Amino acid sequence: MLDPSSSEEESDEGLEEESRDVLVAAGSSQRAPPAPTREGRRDAPGRAGGGGAARSVSPSPSVLSEGRDEPQRQLDDEQERRIRLQLYVFVVRCIAYPFNAKQPTDMARRQQKLNKQQLQLLKERFQAFLNGETQIVADEAFCNAVRSYYEVFLKSDRVARMVQSGGCSANDFREVFKKNIEKRVRSLPEIDGLSKETVLSSWIAKYDAIYRGEEDLCKQPNRMALSAVSELILSKEQLYEMFQQILGIKKLEHQLLYNACQLDNADEQAAQIRRELDGRLQLADKMAKERKFPKFIAKDMENMYIEELRSSVNLLMANLESLPVSKGGPEFKLQKLKRSQNSAFLDIGDENEIQLSKSDVVLSFTLEIVIMEVQGLKSVAPNRIVYCTMEVEGEKLQTDQAEASRPQWGTQGDFTTTHPRPVVKVKLFTESTGVLALEDKELGRVILYPTSNSSKSAELHRMVVPKNSQDSDLKIKLAVRMDKPAHMKHSGYLYALGQKVWKRWKKRYFVLVQVSQYTFAMCSYREKKSEPQELMQLEGYTVDYTDPHPGLQGGCMFFNAVKEGDTVIFASDDEQDRILWVQAMYRATGQSYKPVPAIQTQKLNPKGGTLHADAQLSGKDADRFQKHGMDEFISANPCKLDHAFLFRILQRQTLDHRLNDSYSCLGWFSPGQVFVLDEYCARYGVRGCHRHLCYLAELMEHSENGAVIDPTLLHYSFAFCASHVHGNRPDGIGTVSVEEKERFEEIKERLSSLLENQISHFRYCFPFGRPEGALKATLSLLERVLMKDIATPIPAEEVKKVVRKCLEKAALINYTRLTEYAKIEETMNQASPARKLEEILHLAELCIEVLQQNEEHHAEGREAFAWWPDLLAEHAEKFWALFTVDMDTALEAQPQDSWDSFPLFQLLNNFLRNDTLLCNGKFHKHLQEIFVPLVVRYVDLMESSIAQSIHRGFEQETWQPVKNIANSLPNVALPKVPSLPLNLPQIPNISTASWMPSLYESTNGSATSEDLFWKLDALQMFVFDLHWPEQEFAHHLEQRLKLMASDMLEACVKRTRTAFELKLQKASKTTDLRIPASVCTMFNVLVDAKKQSTKLCALDGGQEQQYHSKIDDLIDNSVKEIISLLVSKFVSVLEGVLSKLSRYDEGTFFSSILSFTVKAAAKYVDVPKPGMDLADTYIMFVRQNQDILREKVNEEMYIEKLFDQWYSSSMKVICVWLTDRLDLQLHIYQLKTLIKIVKKTYRDFRLQGVLEGTLNSKTYDTVHRRLTVEEATASVSEGGGLQGITMKDSDEEEEG
């Protein structure tokens, strides 16, 4: 029991009592009172907003008009207060004694909702993690995932709106993160020994650590608030407290109503239910008799309606009958009667009603007898042993023994009896000391006749002593406690006189026995009898106070029980006893009339109102109860009130409270709320269709105002109403009223609009796929709403048509909000072309992000409809169609031959080509149509630019190796061609890193050739990176670029070969010849051209392959030609050397002169050896040119070919020269020179990698044999010999 605080009591002292009308009469034509509004204040909840008289709407209301409105406002507030109090009375009765519903235990637990402050705290925690301000260790991949989650999700305005609407929990945030990282982790490469599931678990654990922060989770409040336990099974006290908050009831008001309604008295609550059910049956009979029915959609439903009313009451009666007689009391041991559901209230006056037998009302009592002490014992010596015995119905118990000087025990004896009026005998004995004594001596006795109403405290009783006993004042102190069985509702002595029973006016002991929830009997008992002497069933009787009967002697306060054909008069000795008897019999009879004694009426209600007279209500409580005007709410007949209207208010207030608690409920009631609403509907006959129609209306209103409502909940209620209206009888109700039909059609239309609006705003109603499964459920519900009846399915095309229309709107909504966010309209009107292009590129990125989120978070629609992805693709096309307008505007503003828009194409095309439904769709084709001319123009200009750069470049080419300018080349812009009236196009997105490696792969190419190769490669890579989606045009582009490259390479090769020939022609023919770097550069250009042709010109199949072969052949032939030219140049030098040696041929004039001169001079001076300078010079020429070629020509294969041909050609020339002199003996100087040249040449070319087969050719063998023969001849003929020069052991000869 809650005691009111003094402040509350004082604050309520000033409430004035006012006359009140009946709240809402059932079937009344009067307008229903205004319902409490949602904006009701806590101190004055439920204040009407427009329900009463309208306020003045003048722009400047006067004080007088405000004065007139104030009484109206007070009147509205008072009317709402009365409605809430009346509702609370009905609610607390449902809570106090439920007999239909239970708190469900299988409901899904709702999660705690997040608020704005928590969202801001989360942002700060994740920002701190990204800034490295936490102790959480994470790798780069996890940090990137968190950064994406923070930027895309946590900072989203849609998430902020979802939090503000109260439909978001911590679990939603966690699930979104989990969904994001699953996609990331699946795309990571496999790591040995580390599964992706382990990575996911680790990332989730780190997320939880960031989410929690450093707060101490162990700090919990000692007492959980009511809102925190609302998801649990609540006690009655918690339910009372909850609905006090819901209906705005003060503690004092609750206390007064609690006492007045006797909520802790199960008998009173059961009796109240019986009265209510009786009233509902009488109302049904009255309705059937007067033919006043609600309007139904069919006339034959009127009789069915009456049967439904009776059937529902019978069901409630059966539920009540199934309860134990006294909930929570001792086990009920009376015989369970088998009675029909149409019990007493349905069969009043029925001659065949089941009669109780006397054995049906046998009671069982527990007696506790506690013997304390005996006083006045003088007849026995102090040291004698005394004891007491207790006897009930022949069963005896004995106390412990005590000395006569202190006869005290405190012993309790427990007995069980079926006698309402048992006889208890207590005797005092002393032990006999005589030898022949057979039994102890009795000192005194007392006989008691206890009842359940007897005093239970210890009292002194005078004992009857034997004759001649000295103990004239012997007393015993004992307590007799006789319990009151749960099914014995009242007992006591009454005078009675009846026509069928108790036909003589006399005083009897009566017991009011409850046999079952609907069966009560008034029984009179004699002493030591377990069965009543007479009994009367109270079914059909009406009890009331009466005036005294003059002819009856005995009894002071009269009352009677009247039934058709029978009257029983009762009388008690005092008023209090009469009130208790009448109250107990009033509960038992189930009568609707509330008997009130005339004296008490005048005392407690001098104004003449009907007061609930309750003996348990103290005078102070009664005064307060009367003063606060609670009487009308307690005494109001529930059968005469419009419970449909009241329940609508109750459900509305409950839903408002639920949506404002700490849980993300999405419109679902808590178990305690469901229990109370279920019990209310069952007990007060609220039709299921009405309940769900009101629920739908409330849920839709909240949803329209921004709250997050679970569409599954809407689906349940709508399906129930649809089944009811279409005759499927979900709750056994077959009647359908016109009002229900009309309201259902209105709600159906409203619900359809709401669902279509939600689908049109799916990104904002279901942000990031939250609540989980909501979009799928919304689509399923829309299909259900579009059905004409509950059994006929709607064609899929009709649903598809509606959803398609919604998604068309969604495209406009999403794009409009996106452009507003990007402020694209301002940019398009004022910005420069470059700025417009930059903004449209940013907008394209946002559009792609939106569509990717749609696919990621809203693809669940395919679970409802297989065609959802197709419609989502159509939605995307509409979305892109809107983007097309802004894109075309930005592109049209670009200057002619501007290539800055290509990144836009690449961005959009890369997204579209990877989407199977959007690839080559309407927008994709439009994008291609816009960029085809641009690409063609770009390629044309690049072709012209490259051709001119080749022409100009080779004209001015210095053939300086490119490695000398490689460091500055990446920063040099492409050259401008004066003949073109425009700047040459620059390759988009070309960075140094993408082409610098090619410069260092070939370090000796020319600037023109390297520039050509880079441009061709960059152009082809650029076109390849476009990933043109249309195959035919893509193939055309590739073919054109390959053929262009072939043409350019052909021109390059021809110009290089021509330049090579000219350069070589100008070179020296003597041993002073050293291959210029420019010649090596030209050689390298051809080598590079060979390499580049494979990449730049290769196409598979057909003409292109043949064209590529042609380029390869041209390059190969050119390389062969320049090798031949080089070899010819080298051989010509050797021929010059041999020409000089020819002067020493035998028989020539010069040879004779030279030989004579040398011999003569040799006698006097050291003459240099002729021919050695010439040999050394030639050998140096060979070696240095070999080194130059080896160092500066890149391709080893061509160097080997060159050296092979050079060596073979050299040996051939020497062999021919020697062959021409077969008939001549070589001059000694000729021999020395040739031996040295041949030996050194052989050795040097072997060191350069010329193979043995080439080195030891037949030509070489011929030369070797000839020189060996000549050497032998010379050694014989010449006295001085060859001075160590010999063909033998040439490998061991030192360097000369």
Swiss-Prot record:
Q: Does the keyword field hold Membrane?
A: yes
Report domain PH positions. 487-590
Which InterPro entries would you find in this protein's record?
C2_dom, C2_domain_sf, CAPS, MUN_dom, Munc13_1, PH-like_dom_sf, PH_domain
Compositionally biased intervals (Acidic residues):
1-19
**Limits of the C2 domain:** 350-464
Specify where the region named Disordered lies, as residue ranges: 1-78, 1274-1296
Instruction: Report domain DM10 positions.
Output: 293-400
Phosphoserine is carried by which residues? 56, 58, 1290
Choose one Gene Ontology CC annotation of this protein and give it. cilium
The GO annotation for biological process reads: cellular response to starvation; dense core granule exocytosis; exocytosis; hematopoietic stem cell homeostasis; positive regulation of exocytosis; protein transport; synaptic vesicle priming
Q: Name the UniProt key words of this record, in alphabetical order.
A: Calcium, Cell projection, Cytoplasm, Cytoplasmic vesicle, Cytoskeleton, Exocytosis, Lipid-binding, Membrane, Metal-binding, Phosphoprotein, Protein transport, Synapse, Transport
Q: What does this protein do?
A: Calcium-binding protein involved in exocytosis of vesicles filled with neurotransmitters and neuropeptides. Probably acts upstream of fusion in the biogenesis or maintenance of mature secretory vesicles. Regulates neurotrophin release from granule cells leading to regulate cell differentiation and survival during cerebellar development. May specifically mediate the Ca(2+)-dependent exocytosis of large dense-core vesicles (DCVs) and other dense-core vesicles.
In Swiss-Prot or TrEMBL terms, this protein is called Calcium-dependent secretion activator 2
The record lists the organism as Homo sapiens
